[in-house]
Regions:
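A well-structured
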Residues: 1-157, 169
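Active-site-adjacent "gating/activation" loops or surface patches in catalytic cores
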Residues: 35-52, 155, 159-234, 238-243, ...
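Glycine- and acidic
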Residues: 58-66, 104-112, 149-159, 179, ...
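Short, glycine/acidic-rich hinge or "gate" loops at secondary-structure transitions
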Residues: 87-96, 131-146, 183-189, 249-255, ...
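Catalytic Zn2+-binding segment of zinc metalloproteases
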Residues: 238-252, 272
Length: 448
């Protein structure tokens, strides 16, 4: 702690808000209406390729209009964070932030090992998925606006009509995963601990929070009838079950779980619930639709890890080379190099996209709001895949281990929590390769 840092931390927060204001003001005219870039994003799912290209280029052009403004904010933020580290006696901001985030169970070098493993194991697998996408779409090369559309030209899944149906069917799914988890969700329904439907004037987003005195969870979201809503409900359900399972721990500090494992609870639940999404289990889908949902989910996991590595590696570079990172041109260059390392593929044509690729670091809010907070998602996803793999071998034991690990709250180290759940807190080639093989198997089973 350094009293000198109090005004600097306030300044850091204010600069993040300035960044938000810039991003929030980014709108374009689309089909006669002014829309935000977020509101424009569903066009990327449409089968009309010319419209996708038009929307992508329009969004890219609008983002680049704020290039100078975001560069200026970045310089101020970086200088502020350099001063915070210096005032506290740390050699660089990464070292200060590591301790601030209570990262006692892994080091920066562990993260760099994770990056290298992703490059070696996952990037080639992601490249195969891109090749399959290119061929299925009948294209010589993919363009950036071809990466989200369904490759078979199918309409998006439409699993439910209202929040009541979402509740009912998710309740059935949770009961199928484990009767006790079904009981927990029943308590949430009975005690009005769910606010799921989208309505005018409601705050955006979705999350699970806890009422610490009552030791009960509350789930908030904005369901509109999409498959993403189903995933969100099941994901947040995993967080809610974490609250229930750890409720017997006497002190709130014991129930405070790091994100590296908190997200295992939610991500693993998405996978553990996946066999029960079908109508004959009281769920939403036909067998064919359920297989589609599973494959899309697993493929997104593969595609996420390389992007996560870009975001995390960029921050390791920036905060250990702050003098270079104070020049936004160097940041553009570093991001481009990382993009080539983790995201470039012979199957994608990025020609004429240089500036929008190199300024990709402008678009990831975590860099401005919560530095170094992103790798946790990659770690947790790796843990969740291992738990899911256990369930394919012995479903009953996998669920028992999962619940036992949740009951520990934050009352153990990360390696101990992962081990209790039947997983390994490791980021080496072997661990990632085992996960990749499981995902590949899951995709094959989903197709049959």
């Amino acid at each position: 702690f350094s009293e000198k840092n109090l005004p600097l931390l306030t300044s850091d927060a204010k600069l993040s808000k300035e960044y938000d204001a810039i991003i929030g003001s980014q709108t374009v005219r689309w089909e006669g209406e002014e829309v935000t870039l977020t509101q424009l994003s569903p066009v990327m799912l449409k089968t009309d390729r010319k419209n996708r290209e038009k929307a992508w280029k329009m969004a890219a052009k609008r983002r680049l209009e704020d290039r100078q403004s975001i560069n200026e904010i970045w310089i101020k933020i970086l200088k502020t964070r350099m001063s915070i580290a210096k005032n506290s006696g740390y050699g660089d901001y990464r070292a200060w932030r590591w301790e601030y985030l209570k990262r006692f169970d892994y080091t920066p070098e562990d993260c760099l090992t994770f990056h290298r493993s992703i490059e070696k194991v996952i990037v080639p697998l992601a490249d195969k998925l891109l090749k399959n996408r290119k061929e299925a779409l009948g294209l010589e090369k993919l363009k950036p606006w071809d990466l989200s559309v369904d490759i078979y030209g199918r309409e998006p899944l439409s699993p439910f009509k209202d929040a009541g149906e979402l509740e009912d069917k998710c309740h059935n799914i949770f009961k199928s995963v484990d009767p006790v988890l079904g009981e927990y969700f029943g308590v949430m329904r009975k005690e009005n601990l769910l606010d799921l439907d989208n309505r005018k004037g409601k705050a955006p987003g979705g999350y699970c929070t806890e009422y610490p005195f009552q030791r009960l969870p509350f789930i908030f979201m904005n369901a509109v009838g999409t498959h993403s809503d189903v995933q969100t409900m099941i994901h947040e359900g995993g967080h809610a079950f974490h609250v229930f399972e750890s409720a017997e721990l006497p002190f709130s500090s014991q129930r405070d779980v790091g994100m590296e494992f908190a997200e295992v609870a939610s991500m693993a639940m998405e996978l553990l619930a996946s066999p029960y999404l079908t109508v004959d289990n009281g769920g939403f889908y036909t067998d064919k639709e359920s297989s589609r949902a599973r494959i899309e989910h697993l493929e997104k996991i593969i595609m996420f890890w390389p992007y996560m590595a870009v975001v995390d590696a960029f921050q390791h570079w920036a905060y250990t080379n702050p003098d270079k990172a104070l020049n936004p041109d160097n940041c553009d260059s570093e991001w481009s190099d990382l993009w080539k390392r983790f995201q470039m593929s012979e199957h994608i044509d990025y020609s004429d996209c240089g500036d929008i690729i190199s300024t990709g670091w402008h678009n990831k809010l975590h860099i401005y709001h919560v530095p170094f907070y992103y790798v946790e998602y990659g770690m947790a996803q790796l843990g969740s895949i291992q738990i899911w793999g256990n369930s394919l071998r012995d479903r009953k034991k996998a669920i028992q281990d999962y619940r036992a690990a949740l009951s520990l709250g934050g009352n153990a180290t990360l390696p101990e929590l992962y081990e209790a759940a039947g997983a390994k807190f490791s980021f080496d080639d072997e661990t990632l390769l085992n996960a990749a093989n499981l995902i590949s198997l899951g995709c094959i089973l989903g197709e049959n």
